[in-house]
A protein has these predicted regions:
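Membrane-interface "cap" regions at the ends of multi-pass membrane proteins
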Residues: 1-31, 59-64, 68-92, 242-246, ...
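Helix-loop-helix connectors at the membrane interface of multi-pass transporters/channels
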Residues: 2, 111-141, 240-245, 249, ...
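Inter-helical loop and helix-membrane interface segments of multi-pass membrane transporters/permeases
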Residues: 6, 34-39, 74-96, 109-165, ...
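Membrane-embedded translocation segments of transport machinery
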Residues: 10, 14, 169, 173-317
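Loop-to-transmembrane helix boundary motifs in multi-pass membrane proteins
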Residues: 14-17, 23, 146-148, 257-263, ...
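Transmembrane helix-loop junctions in multi-pass membrane proteins
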Residues: 27-40, 156-169, 188-201, 208-213, ...
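Transmembrane helix-loop boundary segments of multi-pass membrane transporters
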Residues: 34-48, 67-71, 167-175, 249, ...
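C-terminal membrane-solvent junction of multi-pass transporters and transport-like membrane proteins
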Residues: 93-98, 328, 334-348, 369-428, ...
Length: 434
């Protein structure tokens, strides 16, 4: 595929949904959601489910719709939105979301290299015999500590992205079912631990003191980021979707499976922390310090560690695939004579060269904070405003109804324009100022 007009499409609805879920499921599910659920309990969960339903219904479906309408990824989607003014304006508007995604891809590749290192050390048994604090410091505080793992991840991701929609679909159909299966297996093991029931009771406790604006905002932000509605990534999934597929229904299924992924992660993480009276944590500390410590102290911990890090690795790779695919497609869309394979190789080399210089967590952490606090929320606002305030209403609604089993009209559009988009702006402002 060169330039606009995507030829490769997903073979079927399952391939599309699993690829979209693969893009959405990532570290926000694995280490963000469990932490916030443990903090907020049932009140947080209720708010979260309401926002997932809303954001899937209008936010996710709008990004899928503009991608399919434009038959293109990020750049082409913005050009489509602004074509009644000037497509060049759309090109300019697409630059911040695209740059944000490139930077996110670089940072994301680092944490996936961490995960791959943890998996290898689980296979060799090193993670079970080492002092976890020393092991983690060696992993995160030493320059170029995971460069070899980093290189392998970049190569594997490039190989599974090389065939565009076809290889993305095949790899997602393989990796995402394994992700869910492995987490279910681990959940069943965790349930057998003495005290696990206390963890689940705490996890689903009804604490009315959590009925607050802060819990509401926390749930809203978590739902938003969990679905990867960033104004950049999900349009490519829509571009690869056939015209006879129901976008809104597929968006609902994607949101449901993303929620299942978050819940199974929480069912593993929270009881583990409670049973062993570990300090509540989120981010790398949960995955690379607390969980290894827990796994060292339970029967079959090494095997569970292998299963766990394999599942998380697969979730990370499927997200990284879409990020890289978005950038490759956008470059090929504008530079029509640029060979796709050459683009993929050059981009992969760029991500690796920049990424290996960020493997120390003191560099990686602030870098990812800047992206997640400032760049991604602003990009999401740009996207929401572009779809609901700039793009012609008829174009968006017609695309939503293409292949739909029921007709969506003014109500769907009104919710997107006057409810969803203001919420995205609120999330952006609160993320920046809090």
């Amino acid at each position: 595929m060169k330039g606009g007009g995507i030829i490769n499409k997903f073979n079927n609805k399952l391939g599309f949904i699993l690829t979209a879920v693969g893009s959405a499921v990532g570290m926000a599910n694995v280490w963000g959601f469990p932490y916030k659920l443990q903090e907020g309990g049932l009140i947080f969960l209720i708010f979260y489910l309401l926002f997932i339903a809303l954001f899937s219904y209008v936010g996710l479906s709008s990004e899928f719709a503009i991608g399919r309408a434009a038959d293109a990824g990020t750049v082409g989607s913005y050009e489509k939105a602004y074509e009644k003014y000037n497509r060049r304006v759309g090109t300019i508007v697409s630059i911040p979301p695209l740059i944000g995604l490139i930077l996110l891809t670089i940072g994301y590749s680092v944490v996936i290299a961490y995960i791959f290192k943890a998996l290898v050390d689980s296979l060799t048994g090193r993670i079970m015999t080492s002092d976890i604090n020393i092991w983690y410091r060696d992993l995160s505080e030493r320059a170029y500590s995971v460069w070899a793992y980093h290189l392998i991840i970049i190569i594997l991701t490039a190989l599974t992205t090389i065939g565009s929609a076809k290889t993305l679909e095949k790899s997602s159909k393989f990796m995402m079912p394994i992700f869910f299966l492995f987490f279910v297996i681990i959940t069943l093991v965790i349930m057998t631990l003495d005290g696990a029931s206390d963890g689940y009771r705490y996890m689903f406790r009804l604490d009315l003191s959590k009925l607050s604006i802060s819990t509401l905002v926390s749930a809203m932000g978590q739902a938003f980021f969990s679905l990867s509605i960033t104004g950049s990534a999900m349009m490519i999934c829509g571009a690869y979707l056939k015209k006879d597929e129901d976008i809104v229904h597929s968006s609902k299924i994607t949101g449901l499976l993303d929620t299942v992924a978050s819940m199974v992660a929480a069912l593993v993480m929270i009881p583990s922390v409670i049973v062993f009276d570990m300090e509540n944590a989120q981010g790398p500390g949960l995955l690379f310090q607390i969980l290894p410590t827990v796994l060292k102290n339970i029967p079959g911990g090494r095997l569970i560690a292998i299963i766990l890090y394999t599942a998380v690795l697969f979730a990370g790779i499927t997200s990284l695939q879409i990020m890289i695919e978005v950038v490759v497609e956008s470059l090929n869309y504008k530079l029509k004579n640029l060979n796709r394979k050459i683009t993929l190789v050059l981009l992969s080399a760029f991500i690796f060269i920049i990424g290996i210089n960020m493997e120390e967590i003191k560099i990686w952490g602030p870098f990812m904070d800047i992206i997640s606090i400032y760049i991604i929320p602003i990009s999401a606002v740009i996207g929401a405003i572009s779809w609901f305030y700039v793009l012609d209403k008829k174009t968006l609604v017609d695309e939503i109804n293409q292949g739909a089993k029921k007709t969506y009209g003014d109500t769907w559009y009104w919710i997107g324009k006057y409810f969803y988009t203001p919420l995205v702006v609120i999330i952006c402002i609160l993320t920046i100022i809090i």
